[in-house]
């Protein structure tokens, strides 16, 4: 048996079913091309009979993608199979994936037929699909709750009819790994023609077991895993592609299995899917979450500085993320502070570690995360636990034209005691407000990242704006929080401006100290 596991991605079919709004044809093509770069073997890109839009998406992707096999879904009905075949006909190679329910509750309650009738429909659908392609996949919907005798019979007959891939879905995420693995093992033991098809699994995450069930299945002989990027999909989602890929890669010695996934494309593909689908990735998500390679515990940080292998079983670079983070918080030890100071070019004799660390802990308790520019301020300036404010917003008035997209903003800002008023236009209210602030402050800041997130629920939820900005080759992070998005955005910018003002003061103070040291050295 081959040790190669086929990765069947269904982000654009099963994954899209979780979205509040459908993706456009252009957006689907963007994701499909990213999946092709990622190296998926098969991509299921739609359900053509469901709508003209889905048909067009499948056809467009089938015409464009060359290195992955394009697949479309069809019920065990001739009209569905016709639509799938027609939409895929422009592809060099394609797969038709047909399915029917096999569990007792589905057969009796949903289909209202006998199992023998359902079996006949399944066989007929596979034979009909084989008229269009040799690559036919058949799925036993709700296989996880199907009586094992019926499941074995269905699989055997579908293979006889010409199915080259048999998919065993845990449609409602009901089984546990030992149970699901037992189903796969039984199929291999009892279905006489099982060696004539690839056994596939499609596990849902209702009980959080989709990845575990899929790994157990390949240990029992399955050789295709159906999954989605970021695990998106119906209800609690699907088996996560990036988790499967990195499990099989990281634990290759133990599992003896491999995929054709280009892991360095994982981060980029995950970010694209998250952005286009408007589904943020939770921070603690395995592999691609913001915290996946972030270390905040002082003990962990100390270990990481000595050897990355102490607390990382894979590297961020392996998934295309070129860095890892040691967040400086109140839990960070002296070793981390010393390391960060060394990275910024400071030797042990440039500062007093006892004084710096005490000041650092006070600031960390107050603001949570401490940044490099905070450390410099603590090093060269006293009483920096309380952040000084050179810029203060006194008034903000915004007028927007929703039909044209233009806006005008008037701001009143206090600059070290002097109040300045300026107005400006912009492409939207935030842009207008930022332009007005730039006029008033004469402060040149380049915003490199803008992120808006909700804190709370409903109409009274607070909007948090996080911005990254560059100033004189340094990076600064500003935060704003308000019920009004424009106000939160302005708060974040003012925060950054005060940080840059403080950085200038630090630089001046640093220069004076260095000049004094040089003059003393010359005496």
Swiss-Prot record:
Entry's Gene Ontology molecular function annotations: 2-isopropylmalate synthase activity; acetyl-CoA C-acetyltransferase activity; manganese ion binding
Region (Regulatory domain): 392-523
Keyword Phosphoprotein included in the entry's annotation: no
Requisite cofactors: Mn(2+)
GO cellular component: cytosol
Pathways involved: Amino-acid biosynthesis; L-leucine biosynthesis; L-leucine from 3-methyl-2-oxobutanoate: step 1/4
Pfam family, one: HCS_D2
Transmembrane domains' residue ranges: none
The reaction(s) this protein catalyses: 3-methyl-2-oxobutanoate + acetyl-CoA + H2O = (2S)-2-isopropylmalate + CoA + H(+)
HAMAP family listed in its UniProt record: LeuA_type1
Subunit structure: Homodimer.
PANTHER family: 2-ISOPROPYLMALATE SYNTHASE 1, CHLOROPLASTIC-RELATED, HOMOCITRATE SYNTHASE-RELATED
The protein, known as: 2-isopropylmalate synthase
């Amino acid at each position: 048996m081959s040790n190669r596991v086929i990765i069947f991605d269904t982000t654009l079919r099963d994954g899209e079913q979780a979205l509040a709004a459908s993706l456009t044809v252009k957006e689907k093509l963007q994701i499909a091309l990213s999946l092709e770069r990622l190296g998926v073997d098969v991509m299921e890109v739609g359900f053509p009979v469901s709508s003209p839009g889905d048909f067009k998406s499948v056809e467009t992707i089938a015409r464009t993608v060359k290195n992955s096999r394009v697949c479309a879904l069809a019920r065990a009905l001739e009209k569905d199979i016709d639509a799938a075949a027609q939409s895929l006909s422009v592809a060099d190679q394609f797969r038709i994936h047909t399915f029917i329910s096999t569990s007792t509750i589905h057969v009796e309650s949903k289909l209202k037929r006998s199992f023998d009738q359902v079996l006949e429909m399944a066989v007929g659908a596979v034979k009909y699909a084989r008229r269009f392609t040799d690559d036919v996949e058949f799925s036993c919907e709700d296989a996880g709750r199907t009586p094992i005798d019926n499941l074995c019979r269905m699989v055997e007959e579908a293979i006889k009819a010409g199915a080259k891939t048999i998919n065993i879905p845990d449609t409602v995420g009901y089984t546990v790994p030992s149970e699901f693995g037992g189903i796969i093992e039984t199929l291999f033991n009892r279905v006489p023609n099982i060696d004539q098809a690839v056994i596939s699994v499609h596990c849902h995450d209702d009980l959080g077991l989709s990845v575990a069930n899929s790994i157990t299945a390949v240990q029992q002989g399955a050789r295709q895993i159906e999954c989605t990027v970021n695990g998106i999909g119906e209800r609690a989602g699907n088996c996560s592609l990036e988790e499967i890929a990195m499990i099989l890669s990281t634990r290759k010695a133990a599992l003896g299995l491999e995929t054709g996934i280009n892991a360095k494309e994982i981060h980029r593909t995950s970010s694209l899917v998250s952005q286009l689908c408007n589904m943020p990735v939770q921070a603690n998500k395995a592999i691609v979450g913001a915290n996946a390679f972030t270390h905040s515990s002082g003990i962990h940080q100390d270990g990481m500085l000595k050897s990355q292998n102490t607390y990382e079983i894979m590297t961020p670079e392996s998934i295309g993320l070129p860095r890892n983070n040691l967040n400086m918080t109140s839990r960070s030890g002296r070793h981390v502070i010393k390391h960060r100071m060394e990275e910024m070019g400071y030797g042990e004799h440039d500062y007093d570690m006892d004084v710096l660390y005490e000041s650092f802990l006070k600031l960390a308790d107050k603001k949570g995360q401490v940044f490099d520019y905070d450390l410099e301020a603590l090093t060269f300036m006293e009483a920096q636990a309380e952040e000084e404010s050179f810029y203060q917003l006194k008034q903000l008035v915004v007028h927007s034209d929703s039909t044209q997209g233009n806006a005008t903003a008037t701001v009143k800002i206090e600059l070290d005691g002097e109040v300045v008023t300026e107005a400006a236009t912009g492409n939207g209210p935030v842009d207008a407000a930022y332009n007005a602030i730039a006029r008033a402050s004469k402060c040149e800041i380049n915003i490199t990242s803008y992120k808006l997130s909700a804190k709370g629920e409903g109409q009274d939820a607070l909007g948090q704006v996080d911005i990254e900005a560059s100033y004189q080759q340094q990076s600064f992070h500003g935060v704003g929080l308000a019920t009004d998005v424009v106000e939160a955005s302005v708060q974040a910018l003012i925060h950054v401006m005060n940080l840059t003002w403080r950085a200038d003061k630090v630089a001046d103070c640093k220069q004076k100290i260095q000049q004094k040291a040089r003059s003393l050295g010359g005496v």
